[in-house]
UniProtKB/Swiss-Prot annotation:
ATP binds at G387, E388, P389, D411, T412, W413, W414, Q415, T416, D500, R515, R526. Catalyzes the conversion of acetate into acetyl-CoA (AcCoA), an essential intermediate at the junction of anabolic and catabolic pathways. Acs undergoes a two-step reaction. In the first half reaction, Acs combines acetate with ATP to form acetyl-adenylate (AcAMP) intermediate. In the second half reaction, it can then transfer the acetyl group from AcAMP to the sulfhydryl group of CoA, forming the product AcCoA. It comes from Sodalis glossinidius (strain morsitans). Gene3D superfamilies: 3.30.300.30, N-terminal domain of ligase-like. Keywords: Acetylation, ATP-binding, Ligase, Magnesium, Metal-binding, Nucleotide-binding. This is Acetyl-coenzyme A synthetase. The modification N6-acetyllysine is found at K609. Acetylated. Deacetylation by the SIR2-homolog deacetylase activates the enzyme. Its cofactor is Mg(2+). It catalyses: acetate + ATP + CoA = acetyl-CoA + AMP + diphosphate. Pfam families: ACAS_N, AMP-binding, AMP-binding_C. Belongs to the ATP-dependent AMP-binding enzyme family. Mg(2+) binds at V537, H539, I542.
C-alpha cells in the first residue's frame, strides 16, 4: 500500500506547546516506571477535599480484578468543574451553545452555569434523589443536559445518559438494568430540521411492564409542541426550578464512588453498563484534555460529539470544564442545512480546537469544496478525530481542506471503558503519520500479543492489550462484575484486552486495524478491514467503504465491500474494473474485493458508527435474525441493502 506522508511538528506550535518531544519521553518513562509519583503529582490537576494518601491499588489478575485509584481521597466533580473557577474566572464563557437552527445560539458563563446547576441539584434533592441514586437522562444537545449531569455529580447521584436517538425498547432496557429513580428529558429534540419525540419515547419506555423504579419525569421545554402529560408523574423543568435556591453545597465524594453509568453495545447484544468512578476518571479526563489538545486559556474548543456518548462525557463536558475551558455544544449536524455548516460554526465562534469523527469527515469529503465554501477557518490551531480509525485519505482531506494544511491532527484511540485517550499524538511532541494514533499517553502501557497471548516485540501486528491500569479505567460493568472480568481480562491473563487489533511500525507508532472480529482470513492471509477500507476510499470516486468477510468455498472468506460513491458519480462496469485494479495496485491481488456492493447508504448508529454486524449477516445471507436494530439511525437501510444484494453476482 502506498506510504502516507509524515508531518513534522510545526515550529509555531513547538514554541508554545505544553509538552515537547523531549518532555514527552521523560514524562512517559516516569509514568511507567514510577506511576505512584507521576500520578501523585498530576492528580493535583483537580482539587481534593480530603487529599489522598494511596495512589494506586490495582491488579489485573483474573481471579480478583481490582481497580482503585486515589481511594482514600474525597472530592466533588461539579465543584472542580465550576466552583473553583468562580473567584478568578467566573465571568468567562463556559458553554457556547449553537442550535440546530443557525439563528439560535447563546453563551453561559461559569457563574451562570454554577447557579443553574445548584438550582437543579436542589430540584433533584426535593424529589428525593440523593447520593448513589441513579438518574436517567434522555436529553437533546442543549445546555440543560450539561446542567443535569453536573447537578447529579454535585449531590452524588449517578447519572445514566441515554443517547437521544435510542428507541423506547432500548431506553427501557437501560432503565431496568440501572434501576433509575428519575428521568430527565425534553418535549422534543431537534436534529437537521427534524423533530425527535423524546417525551413520547420516554412515555413508551416507562409503559414497559418491567420498568418499575421511575416515579418522576422532569421535562425540559425545547420546542413547545403538544405532548402527552401525566400530572401525577411529570413535572416541567421551568416549574421545578422556579424558586429553587441557587446555592447547594457540593457533596464530598469518595474517589471510588460512582460518577456515571454509560451503556455500550455488547457482543451478545445485551448492553453493558460501564461504570466510571469519581476521582480517577476526572483526573484522567482533565489531564488528557489539557495535554492532548494543548489547551491554553481562552481557546475556544468544539467537540462535535453528543453527550449521550463517552466522548461527550469526557471531552465535551468534564475534561474541558475541569480545565476552565470554553466548550462549544452543537445541537445540529455538520452538513445541515448546508455542507459547509461545520466550517460556518468554526468561523462564527472562532473555534481554535475542533474534535470530530471520521464519519463526519468522510461525509463532508464526499461534498468536495462545498464543505468549505464561503469560510476561512483561520482560527483553527489543532484538530482531532475520534470514534474509529481514520483512513489516511480522510486524514489528508481534513488536514488540507478544513485545517488549511497547518493544524496538527490528534487521531485519538480510546474506548468507553478507558474513560479517556489511550494512544494519541501530542501535537507539540510528535510527528504525525496520517492514519496512525501514534504513541501511548502518560501511564498507558500498550502491548501486542498473538492469539495465544505471546508478546509481539518490535514492529509487528497483533491483539492490542494494556498491561497495567490507568486512572480513567472503568471499574466494572454495573451489576455484573463477572461479565466485566470475562469480557476484558480472561482472553489474555493479566492484561486488559481492548478487542481491537493493531500494528506497530518501526518507530513504535500504533495503527489501529479495527475490531479483532473485523479481521478477514482470505486464503490464509489475515487482512484488517480497516486497511482495505482505507485503500478503497483513497480512490478519487469513493466517499465511503465498509468491508466484511463472506463465506467462500475455496478461500475460506471472500472480501465483500459496500461502497458509497462521491456525489455525482454513478456505478458502471468500467468503474467496477477500475476499483478492482486500484486495489491490486494499492495492497495486492489478495485484497481485491470479490464483491462490490454499490449503495448510497450504510447502516449506521445515531452516533455515526457503521453497524458491521448487520453488514456481515447480509453478506453471508444470514438474514433470519439480524438482532437488535433499534440503534440504527435509519432502519429502512437494511431492507434497501437486501434488495440491492439480489441484483449482485456473488462468488461461490
Amino acid at each position: 500500500m502506498s506510504q502516507p506522508h509524515r508531518y513534522p511538528i510545526p515550529a509555531s506550535l513547538a514554541e508554545r506547546t505544553l509538552v515537547s518531544a523531549e518532555q514527552y519521553r521523560k514524562l512517559y518513562e516516569q509514568s511507567i516506571n514510577d506511576p505512584d509519583s507521576f500520578w501523585r503529582e498530576y492528580a493535583q490537576i483537580v482539587e481534593w477535599i480530603t487529599p489522598f494518601q494511596t495512589v494506586k491499588n490495582t491488579t489485573f489478575d483474573p481471579g480478583h480484578v481490582n481497580i482503585r485509584w486515589f481511594e482514600d481521597g474525597t472530592l466533588n466533580v461539579a465543584a472542580n468543574c465550576l466552583d473553583r473557577h468562580l473567584q478568578e474566572r467566573g465571568d468567562q464563557t463556559a458553554i457556547i451553545w449553537e442550535g440546530d437552527d443557525a439563528s439560535q445560539s447563546k453563551t453561559l458563563t461559569y457563574r451562570q452555569l454554577h447557579q443553574a446547576v445548584c438550582r437543579f441539584a436542589n430540584v433533584l434533592k426535593a424529589q428525593g434523589i440523593g447520593k448513589g441514586d441513579v438518574v436517567a437522562l434522555y436529553m437533546p444537545m442543549v445546555p440543560e443536559a450539561a446542567v443535569a449531569m453536573l447537578a447529579c455529580a454535585r449531590i452524588g447521584a449517578v447519572h445514566s445518559v441515554i443517547f437521544a436517538g435510542f428507541s423506547p425498547e432500548a431506553i427501557a432496557g437501560r432503565i431496568i438494568d440501572s434501576s433509575a429513580k428519575l428521568v430527565v428529558t425534553a418535549d422534543e429534540g431537534l436534529r437537521a430540521g427534524r423533530k425527535i419525540p423524546l417525551k413520547k419515547n420516554i412515555d413508551d419506555a416507562l409503559n414497559h411492564p418491567e420498568v418499575k423504579s421511575v416515579n418522576r419525569v422532569i421535562v425540559f421545554r425545547r420546542t413547545g409542541n403538544a405532548i402527552d402529560w401525566q400530572p401525577e408523574r411529570d413535572v416541567w423543568w421551568h416549574d421545578a426550578i422556579d424558586g429553587a435556591d441557587d446555592t447547594c453545597p457540593p457533596e464530598a465524594m469518595g474517589a471510588e464512588d460512582p460518577l456515571f453509568i454509560l451503556y455500550t453495545s455488547g457482543s451478545t447484544g445485551t448492553p453493558k453498563g460501564v461504570l466510571h468512578t469519581t476521582g480517577g476518571y476526572l483526573v484522567y479526563a482533565a489531564t488528557t484534555f489539557k495535554y492532548v489538545f494543548d489547551y491554553h486559556p481562552g481557546d475556544v474548543y468544539w467537540c462535535t460529539a453528543d453527550v449521550g456518548w463517552v466522548t461527550g462525557h469526557s471531552y465535551l463536558l468534564y475534561g474541558p470544564l475541569a480545565c476552565c475551558a470554553i466548550t462549544l455544544m452543537f445541537e445540529g449536524v455538520p452538513n445541515w442545512p448546508a455542507a459547509s455548516r461545520m466550517a460556518q460554526v468554526v468561523d462564527k465562534h472562532q473555534v481554535n480546537i475542533l474534535y470530530t469523527a471520521p464519519t463526519a469527515i468522510r461525509a463532508l469529503m464526499a461534498e468536495g469544496d462545498k464543505a468549505i465554501t464561503g469560510t476561512h477557518r483561520s482560527s483553527l490551531r489543532i484538530m482531532g478525530s475520534v470514534g474509529e480509525p481514520i483512513n489516511p485519505e480522510a486524514w489528508e482531506w481534513y488536514y488540507h481542506k478544513i485545517g488549511n494544511g497547518r493544524c496538527p491532527i490528534v487521531d485519538t484511540w480510546w474506548q468507553t471503558e478507558t474513560g479517556g485517550f489511550m494512544i494519541t499524538p501530542l501535537p507539540g511532541a510528535m510527528a504525525l503519520k496520517p492514519g496512525s494514533a501514534a504513541l501511548p499517553f502518560f501511564g498507558v502501557q500498550p502491548a501486542l500479543v498473538d492469539n495465544v497471548g505471546t508478546p509481539v516485540d518490535g514492529a509487528g501486528e497483533g491483539n492490542l492489550v494494556i498491561t497495567d491500569s490507568w486512572p480513567g479505567q472503568a471499574r466494572t460493568l454495573y451489576g455484573d462484575h463477572d461479565r466485566f472480568k470475562q469480557t476484558y481480562f480472561y482472553t489474555f491473563k493479566g492484561m486488559y484486552f481492548s478487542g481491537d487489533g493493531a500494528r506497530r511500525d518501526e518507530d513504535g507508532y500504533y495503527w489501529i486495524t479495527g475490531r479483532v472480529d473485523d479481521v478477514l482470513n482470505v486464503s490464509g492471509h489475515r487482512l484488517g478491514t480497516s486497511e482495505i477500507e482505507s485503500a478503497l476510499v483513497a480512490h478519487p470516486k469513493i466517499a465511503e467503504a465498509a468491508v466484511v468477510g463472506m463465506p467462500h468455498n475455496i478461500k475460506g472468506q471472500a472480501i465483500y465491500a459496500y461502497i458509497t460513491l462521491n456525489a455525482g458519480e454513478t456505478p458502471t462496469p468500467e468503474l467496477y474494473n477500475e476499483v478492482r485494479a486500484w486495489m491490486r495496485k494499492e495492497i495486492g491481488a489478495i485484497a481485491t474485493p470479490d464483491v462490490l456492493h454499490w449503495t448510497d447508504s450504510l447502516p449506521k448508529t445515531r452516533s455515526g458508527k457503521i453497524m458491521r454486524r448487520i453488514l456481515r449477516k447480509i453478506a453471508a445471507g444470514d438474514t433470519g435474525n439480524l438482532g437488535d436494530t433499534s440503534t440504527l439511525a435509519d432502519p429502512g437501510v437494511v431492507e434497501k441493502l437486501l434488495e440491492e444484494k439480489h441484483t449482485l453476482t456473488l462468488p461461490s
